[in-house]
Amino acid sequence: MPRQSGFGWAWRVPLALAGSLAAATASGYLLTRGLPLDDPLERLYAGLFGALGVGLLLLVGGLLARGPGNFAWRLGGSLLVLGLALWLLAGRG
C-alpha cells in the first residue's frame, strides 16, 4: 500500500490540538464576558462548558478530517452554527 503524502498524522495532531485549545480559550473568554446573564457564576459556567464544547468539536473535526479542504469546510460549518447559536442566545437577553 503506497504511503499517502500531505495532511498526515504528524501534522494533524499538533494542529488539531493547538487550534482547538486556542479556539476553546477564545470562545470561553468571549462567552464569559459577553453573555447577558445576571449571575457571574452562571456566566462562568456557561463560558467553561461552551469552551469545552467548542474545543472538543474542533479537536474531533480536526482529527477526523480527510484533508485540509475537508477540515476547512467542517470548521466553517461549525463556526457558522456556533455564531448562529450565540446570536440567538444573545437575542433572548
From Swiss-Prot:
Q: Which domain of life is it from?
A: Bacteria
Which first-to-last residue range defines the signal peptide?
Answer: 1-25
**Can you say where in the cell this protein is located?**
Cell membrane
Q: Where are the transmembrane segments?
A: 44-64, 71-91
Show the GO cellular component annotation of the record: plasma membrane
How is it placed in the membrane, per its record? Answer: Multi-pass membrane protein
Task: Give the record's keywords alphabetically.
Answer: Cell membrane, Membrane, Signal, Transmembrane, Transmembrane helix
> Would the keyword Cell membrane be found if you checked this record's keyword annotation?
yes
Instruction: Give yes or no: UniProt keyword Protein biosynthesis.
Output: no
Q: What does this protein do?
A: May play some role in transport of Fe(3+)-pyochelin.
* Name recorded for this polypeptide: Protein FptB
